[in-house]
């Protein structure tokens, strides 16, 4: 168990400028992978008033309409009219994408695909906890669900005055390592100029917060901050610049676990920043699902051009039923953590990445089919081999 009495995590909506950038990068990755599953893609996006700027390195046989994909993605997020300050049909799209360095390619590609080297050096973490049904930390799980609900109400038209940009933050109280109460909720949402703050706060409380958060964790002392600065009409790329990879804690575990520093969006599976982080989640989740530990953090590290991980480490925070040595041996036996092994173990060579770019890459309820790293199909054999 952890020693926190209070722990806070945040999430942001699909209309947050950094998340816009992530979605554009992953939309381009998906479009390329529909034509070329073995493309090398590292696509970065910058969004600011009136412009989308693309940069990075892509080597592919695919022939895609980059500008159209960018515009369609921006429009689908909800920035489709000048009244919102950003219009996918009229914004500038500036393309500065080049090709992957041949020096990197020679370190990754191999005659035998199973010997594929890591696309870069680096360290990645995976994490799981039994404090929620999806084996995620409760603060980030609740924050994501608040943001999903905001999007649902905006897209359905139930709350017509909602706009795409929003943020949520949830502070949980822990007792003996278990969530016992929600201490504070912060929710800020962009809105049309003609909604009063009183009406907005009531609607957010009744239709978002109370709809999402467990009633047994809310109490008389729970503090609510709904649009605490008042008006939030100017948002999205007009209010702030957005860049791919700036919401890596939102994307993962809300700060409850460590992070190796590498972002996910816009990267094909040869980039271990992404694929090994997914594998780390898969390993940790199966360890917890198997009952080997109540909490598990897995670290994996790589050297560029080398297939085998340079290290595999685990931390179970004193909750394990077997030793760390036993768990690591089980990991080595049942999980292929070479880049090629990860790609095929998790079926990562498919165009499904744009859907990961909002509301977290991990712990999405009902996502096990699309997000293969959320499966717990190794739990039974891990439990059997651990003799517990």
Swiss-Prot record:
Give the subcellular location: Cytoplasm
Q: Where does L-methionine bind?
A: 57, 100, 240, 271
Which Gene3D superfamilies has this protein been placed in? Answer: 3.30.300.10
Can you name the source organism? Psychrobacter sp. (strain PRwf-1)
Protein name per Swiss-Prot or TrEMBL: S-adenosylmethionine synthase
The record's section on SUPFAM superfamilies has: S-adenosylmethionine synthetase
Q: Which GO terms describe its cellular component?
A: cytoplasm
Keyword terms, alphabetized? ATP-binding, Cytoplasm, Magnesium, Metal-binding, Nucleotide-binding, One-carbon metabolism, Potassium, Transferase
Q: Where does ATP bind?
A: 16, 165-167, 231-232, 240, 246-247, 263, 267
Under Gene Ontology molecular function, one entry of this record is: ATP binding
Q: Which reaction does it catalyse?
A: L-methionine + ATP + H2O = S-adenosyl-L-methionine + phosphate + diphosphate
Q: Which PANTHER family match?
A: S-ADENOSYLMETHIONINE SYNTHETASE (PTHR11964)
